[in-house]
Amino acid sequence: FKPQFARISLEGFIDMFRRYWAHMIVVFSVYLWKDILDGLDRILMANTQLDMTFLVYAIEGDASLWVQEGLRNDFLDVIMTHFYVMGFMIATFSSFIYPIYFDDRHMADRVSLSMFWVYILAIPFYLFLNVKVTGNYIQGMETIAYDLTPEIHNWFNRIDPFTNGMPSLHIGLPFAIWLTMHRWDEDGRW
């Protein structure tokens, strides 16, 4: 996975933190925002009863139910839930760390800024497009990830309850990173 010119070493990691600390603060500050925005979102939901589920359902219909019924498999349930809980975060943030570690400031600037702007643009949708969990709204739909294990159920309830609508960061972040790498990779390294 590393470019041919790259060498992995402890000194490289130390140098990476020394040279790119501002990039890391920009991207990882999102975790601080998430706690603040989650608190604000819960206050808004409790006081305004915002529910835009009918709008999302008007666009999607029962498509997610058809996908669930067509692809339902116990093995996929476990793999995809665990990938979502850990793999998605690792894949997203390693794509940010990758150009930083290999000292490509041009790409590091663009990837960190694209991730930053995706989060900024998602805030109004996050706060004002609250939706119900799909399994609680669509008749016959199961909340597979919620019900896989008690630990994962607790994680979803506390950290990512799926109550915020479009545009999804789960699509927005990987797409923005891919688009950034595709558009700004001038030397063909990435």
Question: Where are the model-predicted features located?
Answer:
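Hydrophobic cores of alpha-helical transmembrane segments in multi-pass inner/ER membrane proteins
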Residues: 1, 25-30, 91-95, 176-179
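Transmembrane alpha-helices
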Residues: 1-7
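Generic serine detector
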Residues: 9, 29, 64, 94-95, ...
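Short amphipathic alpha-helical segments, especially helix-boundary/capping motifs
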Residues: 10-13, 69-73, 85, 98-99, ...
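N-terminal transmembrane-helix/juxtamembrane module of multi-pass inner/ER membrane proteins
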Residues: 10-90
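Membrane-interface loops
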Residues: 39-54, 101-188
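Hydrophobic alpha-helical transmembrane segments
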Residues: 82-99, 170-176
